[in-house]
């Protein structure tokens, strides 16, 4: 069973494993240094749909379908799915996954949605309430611009501090199958006001220039990134950037 260690860390004692995963992206991402590692890439930002929001839903649908296919599973074999995106009412997830009829939990954590989904799915598998669970998220540059800044049709000038939101979707399948990358534990952070006043510079609030990694005396939770992530295809090129740290 799950065991709390310190104030923020939870140890998963039964063993939860990432049995399958996928990442699908749009044209800008496919042109980057990780382009060859993605499962699928698309040059059409609409993905054949008639709106950017529908295109994002399609990305999420394709990601989950790819993850299931790589695990030789159908939607009926999944007990629960934790999904989220950046749009109102999580419509990217709701419309993208509705045909699969998997028990659905909608999440909204902005850029932390994937981590939040992994935490929730891992906890469900650890507790035995799900044999197989999926965590998935998505975003789309064009739908995010409409949601948070200005629609592209408006033709507004982008400020230099405005980041470029990813067009893509990623999903992972978690189970106790005793194979794949193991999720040992997770550490939940706290709310910190970084006093970012530029409303266009949303990335600065999500990626602070420094992070406290020294553990509190009351929390000795140890979270290893390097030893697990280095084996994931798609993250192999980034493995040198990950080190084992103690988090508070």
Positions of predicted regions on the chain:
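Condensing-enzyme catalytic core mediating Claisen C-C bond formation in acyl metabolism
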Residues: 1-53, 150-217, 223-225, 241-247
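Solvent-exposed alpha-helices and their adjacent loops that cap or buttress functional pockets
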Residues: 7-11, 73-74, 96-99, 113, ...
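Conserved beta-ketoacyl condensing-enzyme motif
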Residues: 18, 53-111, 220-241
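Short beta-strand segments
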Residues: 19, 83-84, 133-139, 174
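Short glycine-enriched loops at secondary-structure junctions
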Residues: 24, 83-89, 139-140, 179
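Short acidic, glycine/serine/threonine-rich loops at helix termini
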Residues: 29-31, 92-94, 144-149, 238
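Short, well-ordered, mixed-charge alpha-helical segments that flank or form enzyme active sites
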Residues: 89-91, 141-146, 182, 192-196, ...
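Active-site-proximal alpha-helical scaffold in enzymes
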Residues: 108-135, 174
